[in-house]
A protein has these predicted regions:
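Active-site-adjacent beta->alpha loops and helix N-cap segments on the catalytic face
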Residues: 75-77, 137-151, 166-167, 190-199, ...
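Active-site gating loops and adjacent loop-to-helix segments of metal-dependent hydrolytic enzymes
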Residues: 45-46, 59-67, 102-128, 170-187, ...
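A conserved glycine-rich beta-strand in the N-terminal activation segment of trypsin-fold
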Residues: 15-24
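Glycine-centered positions in the ABC transporter ATPase nucleotide-binding domain
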Residues: 7-8, 25-26, 320
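C-terminal cap of metal-dependent C-N hydrolases
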Residues: 286, 296-329
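His/Asp/Glu-enriched, well-ordered alpha-helical/loop segment
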Residues: 200-209, 227-300, 304-307
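Divalent metal-dependent hydrolysis catalytic cores, especially in the metallo-beta-lactamase
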Residues: 53-81, 90-102, 129-139, 143, ...
Length: 329
């Protein structure tokens, strides 16, 4: 199938320019600059979300790839979750958030199911080949061995729900941790003489920061500081999407209510279109090893988010096939 799309092409590396994409057999076959051409719709690489609990609404927000996420649960729940991952070309695997977390940083996770690191349980999950990311607290006994176990199985060790100090966080990165789950939330903060996990995450260029930029989880100034300190090439916009999101009696937030284009709109207003595409598309795709996604260049898969001039979604394409389209009035 062949299709030509014309509008404002937003590539994380080449920037935003008027042009056209030629799509053939699920791939981007050609890219043509058209100076003076139309600047709507806005065409961006499809968004990739590394932490999403409720993925059904995601394609309507331009999300073309996601990690289906399961939280801290009773024994046996993760196994059943992995057996029933959605049969969806956009599902890139699972993110297991917990249960090896610090109870003092449980946040909205089910504290009653937090438990010590269990190498046998973890190995069972990893043996399915469906787990792409596991979030754990690095200060737990056995956490460093678990980080190595995850990495050797081809997964991404992620750090989160932690009260660790700066040194332990840094050592965990040295051990192989490569992602910070919803940075700032449910983790030790930054102080003048005790920079905590945050200090290590901002400092160390080997780790990617999951930023929930929905306007609820973080103050806008915190979002700004994080992007400016780490740079867009180390930020992956994540949604933690749950329907409906809840505020628990202890004031903790359970999940987010915005994903994909809704996050991009907030970031683009402050950092620009190309930088937003970097954080929403290229960085998470690269972290997952998806070398054919996240850019608008020939040979890449035609996973696209097509937006109007206000960055509201118009259409979502996965491998060149339309999977969602906004109804016209």
């Amino acid at each position: 199938m062949t299709r030509t799309l014309e509008g404002l092409l937003v590539d994380p590396v080449d920037g935003a320019r008027a042009g056209a994409l030629l799509l053939e057999n699920g791939l981007i076959a050609g890219v043509e600059a058209r100076p003076g051409g139309p600047e709507e719709p806005v065409i961006m690489p499809g968004f990739v979300d590394l932490q999403i609990y409720d993925w059904e609404p995601a394609r309507a927000q331009g999300v073309t790839g996601y990690l289906a996420t399961v939280g801290t649960s009773a024994p046996g729940v993760v196994e059943r979750f992995l057996e029933t991952l959605p049969d969806d070309p956009s599902c890139l695997g699972a993110h297991v958030e917990g249960p090896y977390l610090n109870p003092d940083a449980a946040g909205a996770q089910a504290a009653e199911h937090i438990r010590p690191v269990d190498a046998r349980e973890l190995g069972g999950w990893l043996s399915t080949g469906r787990v792409r990311m596991v979030t754990l607290a690095p200060e737990l006994h056995g956490a460093f061995a678990a980080i190595e176990q995850i990495a050797l199985a081809g997964g991404i060790p992620a750090l989160g729900h932690t009260a660790t100090n700066h040194r332990t966080a840094w050592l965990a990165i040295d051990e192989g941790a490569r992602f910070a789950t919803h940075v700032w939330n449910a983790m030790s903060g930054f102080r003048a003489r005790a920079p905590g996990a945050i200090g290590a995450f901002l400092e160390d260029e080997r780790i990617t920061l999951g930023l929930n930029a929905d306007g609820r989880h973080l103050h806008p100034a915190t979002e700004e500081l994080t992007v400016r300190a780490a740079g867009p090439r180390r930020i992956a916009l994540t949604s933690d999407l749950v329907r409906p999101p809840q505020e628990l009696p202890n004031g903790k937030l359970l999940g987010g209510d915005r994903c994909g284009a809704a996050l991009v709109r907030r970031m683009a207003a402050r950092f620009g279109l190309a930088e937003s595409a970097t954080m929403a598309s290229l960085v998470p795709a690269e972290l997952l090893g998806l070398t054919d996604r996240g850019r608008l260049v020939p040979g890449f898969r035609a996973d696209l988010a097509i937006l109007d001039g206000s960055l509201e979604p118009l259409e979502t394409l996965v491998a060149g096939t339309s999977v969602w389209r906004r109804d016209e009035p």
